Structures are given as C-alpha cells and as structure tokens.
Amino acid sequence: FGMPEEVEIQSNMGLEGAEGALATALGYATASEKINFIVLGDISFFSGMTALWNSNYGSNIRLMVINNGGNAQQQSLPGFTPDNRTLRMITGAHQTSAKAWAEDRGLTYLSAHNEEELQAALPAFVKPDITRQPLFLEVFTDKASDVEALKQYYKSLKKS
C-alpha cells in the first residue's frame, strides 16, 4: 500500500473470529506514544467492547468500527445460504449503534452513513495530533454491498 517506513502495522484477527482484537489493540496503544488506529467490524467491537472499561488507555486512540449490521465475512463464504435463523445465529445480525457506549466511555464519537459524511469525518479522525479524548468513528455500510465486495476480493485472490 505504499506506507511510509515509519508507519507500523499490527494485525490481530483472533482465531478466525472477533474475540480479543480490541483489548489487544488497546493494550498495545497504552504502551505507545504514537497515534494508534484500530479498525474493527461491528461484531468484533461488540464482542470486545468491555475492554473500554479499562480507562488506562490514552487519547492516542483512533477507533473505527465498520457497522453493517452483522458479520458480512461469514455471509461471503462459499456455501452460505441465508435464512432468518442463520442470519441471527451465525452472522450476529443486529440493528445496534455503538454511539452510547463510546460516549459513555469518554470517546469523542463521529459517524458516517454515506460517502459524503465519511469524507467530512475523516480529516478529524486521521489528524496526526493527539486529541483531548480518544476518537471513535462508526461507519455504517450496506451489508449486501460488503458481502459482494468480499466475494469479489476472494475471487481476485484465486486468480493471482
């Protein structure tokens, strides 16, 4: 992706799942003086949001949650056939926002429901200065579009 050499990239997906990613990222950020960007899906965030109870993290946190109402990754797997039970049990389908939780934990909450709102929120989110409070950006996306994009991505990997 052509990142500058001084940019460090860490990744933690857990064991093909969501658990522990937020707690691990917050722990790493606590030991760092740099701004730390944490990007999670909604299910990963909601399953690990109690990590925010530990308020020892600093204001160098930039937390982005991609909220598409459930786990699009599961729906993009071959052989997945959605029905009401499958959507609820396997993908964690929901209609929940993280706004109240983020604000309650002292994070500055930003949101985007479309490209225009995302472009408006990004300058504050990526600003290189440490802010008074950690920043939280919730990006609402369309799950069907996300599923299709993932399927296309997986197809492109097979061609490579």
Question: What are the roles of these predicted feature ranges?
Answer:
Residues 1-160:
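Thiamine diphosphate
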